[in-house]
Amino acid sequence: MKITIFGATGATGTCLVEQAVATGHQVTAVVRNPARLATPAGPRLRILTADVMDPAAISPAVTGADAVLSAVGPRGSGPTTVSQDSARSIIEAMQESGVRRLITVSGSVVSDIGEGPLMSYLLKPIVRRTLLRHVCADMRRAEEAIGASNLDWTIMRPPRLTGKAATGTYRTAIDRNLPGEYTISRADLVTCMLSLLDDESSMHRHIAIAN
């Protein structure tokens, strides 16, 4: 499958590029600085230098793709619009190019559905008002923009991401969080994302995932 990956130089994006290439996909990685890309260009990996915030600049990367995957997200906990701005730009480029399949990474902090009382009524509200206030608001607006689009989207909602090796063992839930599950390895998250590329049952759904 021909896939385009945004956020390819981040921790999750790096893993996504590596697994996508290793499993035989034809990958276009969109980066601002090619020197930061861990996987070198090759027969299955094309590198395009562009700013994800510029729909016209990323259009060549999206055109002809079977699917787009985004691991773009903010760094740090300060004020940010990275998630929402990149989502709107990607949506515009995809709509102009006629590409419909989008899988993107958000976070479990955005939703309380499926959580137990302690998490829903105490811990998450505190986190959303304090430590992750800006990040959560940004993710929520990105999700709203994606949900309002005409794309065949899937939004991944992982809890805390770790750098542990893939286990191949993870749980998922549709449109609700997994209670009592607090981590997922990036490697397992990426494995799941790639498995959903042509899964119609995951379209227009929020997928929780945890180890």
Each model region followed by its residue ranges:
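Conserved beta-loop-beta element that borders a ligand/cofactor-binding pocket
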Residues: 143-164
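Conserved Rossmann-fold cofactor-binding substructure of NAD(P)-dependent oxidoreductases
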Residues: 43-66
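NAD(P)-cofactor binding segment of oxidoreductase domains
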Residues: 75-102, 137, 141
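Glycine/proline-rich active-site loop of Rossmann-fold NAD(P)-dependent oxidoreductases
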Residues: 115, 165-170, 196-205
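N-terminal Rossmann-fold cofactor-binding loop
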Residues: 30-35, 51-52
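Substrate-positioning beta->alpha
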Residues: 82, 86-87, 138, 156, ...
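N-terminal Rossmann NAD(P)H-binding glycine-rich loop of SDR-like oxidoreductase domains
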Residues: 3-23
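Alpha-helical membrane-targeting segments
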Residues: 111, 115-135, 178
